[in-house]
Amino acid sequence: MTQLISVNSRSYRLSSAPTIVICVDGCEQEYINQAIQAGQAPFLAELTGFGTVLTGDCVVPSFTNPNNLSIVTGAPPSVHGICGNFFFDQETQEEVLMNDAKYLRAPTILAEMAKAGQLVAVVTAKDKLRNLLGHQLKGICFSAEKADQVNLEEHGVENILARVGMPVPSVYSADLSEFVFAAGLSLLTNERPDFMYLSTTDYVQHKHAPGTPEANAFYAMMDSYFKRYHEQGAIVAITADHGMNAKTDAIGRPNILFLQDLLDAQYGAQRTRVLLPITDPYVVHHGALGSYATVYLRDAVPQRDAIDFLAGIAGVEAVLTRSQACQRFELPEDRIGDLVVLGERLTVLGSAADKHDLSGLTVPLRSHGGVSEQKVPLIFNRKLVGLDSPGRLRNFDIIDLALNHLA
């Protein structure tokens, strides 16, 4: 078996102990702090003693797909090409989901590990990530969302519902993430993969603020699984795809800037196109509203004038040109618009008001996408070695840290 592999200009040592990398979707660090203070996360609380607790930056836009793919490639979107959940395909002139592996431009560490002879397992909450994370992977790969369809030929394992002892959970529930952890425990106990990647859903974080009973119960559930993985001798590495913030005014009303309506009023209809890369099939909990948008200019709308107009709107944190955004956030130039707009911490960006169904927002809006959701945890159940001055850490450094720098 190969002991060292090279993927996207980085080298990884193959682990001799089961290694579990966990992406906790929407894990604003305050959730962990509050759960620990409430006595709901004793294992995480103990990690300051025998493990490592750090902070890193996620990829901007701070959305699910770009960050999960950055984690499993060890590289930013400029390398792997996935810069949102949704993008405007210039060739077809259509807005499309980036769930298809044909949009992926780089190999994953997961697939390369499997090629090197390791048993690799991937369990995701939502099926939207399965094709991307499992691209060219010869191993185990399935989603909790479609656990009833898991079979040996396609997914590398079978009878997962019976093994886990849970029914197929609702996609809008905490149970969807718990199924991921329970499935991971079953795989660790039975197949004992060399490397496992677990990715959850941020349904709870969209609905419940840090320190609420629902949030603390969710983190207590995760904490119990982290402890069991640890007790079975696994290396456990935990990070997030993005943080989460309230996007409301002082009395809980959504703070929304409908950019398409504002641009249409300024320049006329059909002269600009606002695209929201947070858009995906699961919009009940966020209404396709996030703090990052990209804008395409048409019919000779002056770029400088559009920048000044957008930057002058209260709630807009920054407006960047395509080249500025690509340089700052390491994005692929052919998959973003002429401008990138970032909302302030308490503000989300929409397109046109009549394009968003907010009926599912039964609690004050919480969302992500901007730089205010960039800080994420980097947590390990072992001490880091050989990294005296690590400098800026990213969530997509986690596999390198887990395989190359843990005692």
UniProtKB/Swiss-Prot annotation:
Residues annotated to bind Zn(2+) 2: D202, H206, H368
Regulation: Completely inhibited by EDTA and 1,10-phenanthroline. Moderately inhibited by the phosphonocarboxylic acids phosphonoformate and 3-phosphonopropionate and the phosphonate herbicide glyphosate. Partially inhibited by the reducing agents sodium sulfide and dithiotheitol and the chelating agent iminodiacetate. Nonphosphonate analogs of phosphonoacetate, such as arsonoacetate, sulfonoacetate and malonate are poor inhibitors. Inorganic phosphate, acetate and the known phosphonotase inhibitor phosphite have little effect on activity.
Classification via Gene3D superfamilies: Alkaline Phosphatase, subunit A (3.40.720.10), Domain 2, Phosphonoacetate Hydrolase (3.30.1360.110)
GO function terms (MF aspect): metal ion binding; phosphonoacetate hydrolase activity
GO biological process: phosphonoacetate metabolic process
EC number per UniProt: 3.11.1.2
Family matches, as NCBIfam families: hydr_PhnA (TIGR02335)
Protein name: Phosphonoacetate hydrolase
